[in-house]
Amino acid sequence: MPKKKTGARKKAENRREREKQLRASRSTIDLAKHPCNASMECDKCQRRQKNRAFCYFCNSVQKLPICAQCGKTKCMMKSSDCVIKHAGVYSTGLAMVGAICDFCEAWVCHGRKCLSTHACACPLTDAECVECERGVWDHGGRIFSCSFCHNFLCEDDQFEHQASCQVLEAETFKCVSCNRLGQHSCLRCKACFCDDHTRSKVFKQEKGKQPPCPKCGHETQETKDLSMSTRSLKFGRQTGGEEGDGASGYDAYWKNLSSDKYGDTSYHDEEEDEYEAEDDEEEEDEGRKDSDTESSDLFTNLNLGRTYASGYAHYEEQEN
């Protein structure tokens, strides 16, 4: 009979199994849930931003830095491979950090494993927004990945890009190489392909996955599973040009919207007529006020004798 497993052996096997699952799921972890892309609130200016070594807005250092690799805020001496040996049971704050990543601009703890592996496996190595072309060092927000083309997006453009990225610009769902119906759609090239034309000599199909796009190599999806419109939408921050100081916002979008809505001359003529009518009404109101003041001046010197309003009427009643 096999030997009975001890408690320490069971714990070691469970730990190895958990580490194996973590290594397998590390490549499929969501970018928004990665420690180097976590949400952080500055202790000084109270502004929310991406996890950073220094605040993007006020350059202050956080009281509890978060490791960009393991996500911990406290280094335990017994259970960690510390490069810098520290006195006491644990260390926090600047005593826990060991480096700053050049790609994600976040602290890395002084653990040997984090220091040696994070720079090579940082998910924000080439993180540049596909819409505004800003990197991690150019804005304070978090970085996201498009669900359709899997390009990097900043926090300002993520919703608008994904809303327009799922739109097919073609008027038909037919294959681009023939007239047959395309069963596979590439969301990066915005094109459909049939079964025969998805086969490519350059990009090989992996086992258990959809065939790659013959143009860009991006994984295709079945057209029947997609709910896409054939209209292309133009809206959001990137529709207008940048301003003089290099900042672009929603001002150009609202200006274009208002100009399209009220651009005809008939609207401006009606608006001028309304302004003239309002001016005439104001002049009439002023004339009425002047006439009221003149009539009140005429009756100021009029004496009606002792009346109830003057307070002397009760004397006349007693005399009678």
Swiss-Prot record:
Record-level GO cellular component terms: chromosome, centromeric region; ciliary basal body; cilium; cytosol; midbody; nucleolus; nucleoplasm; nucleus
C4-type zinc-finger residues: 42-58, 67-104, 129-149, 175-189
Origin: domain of life: Eukaryota
Origin organism lineage: Eukaryota, Metazoa, Chordata, Craniata, Vertebrata
Basic and acidic residues composition bias: residue spans: 10-22, 216-225
Positions of modified residues (Phosphoserine): 291
Motif interval(s): Nuclear localization signal: 3-11
Subcellular location: Nucleus; Nucleus, Nucleolus; Chromosome, Centromere
Protein name: Zinc finger protein 330
Family: Belongs to the NOA36 family.
Tissue specificity of this protein: Widely expressed. Higher expression seen in heart and skeletal muscle.
Keywords (A to Z) from UniProt: Centromere, Chromosome, Metal-binding, Nucleus, Phosphoprotein, Repeat, Zinc, Zinc-finger
Pfam families cross-referenced by the UniProt entry: NOA36
Disulphide bridges, residue numbers: none
Biased composition (Acidic residues): 269-285
Organism of this sequence: Homo sapiens
A molecular-function term among this protein's GO annotations: metal ion binding
The keyword Phosphoprotein appears for this protein: yes
Region annotation (Disordered) ranges: 1-23, 206-320
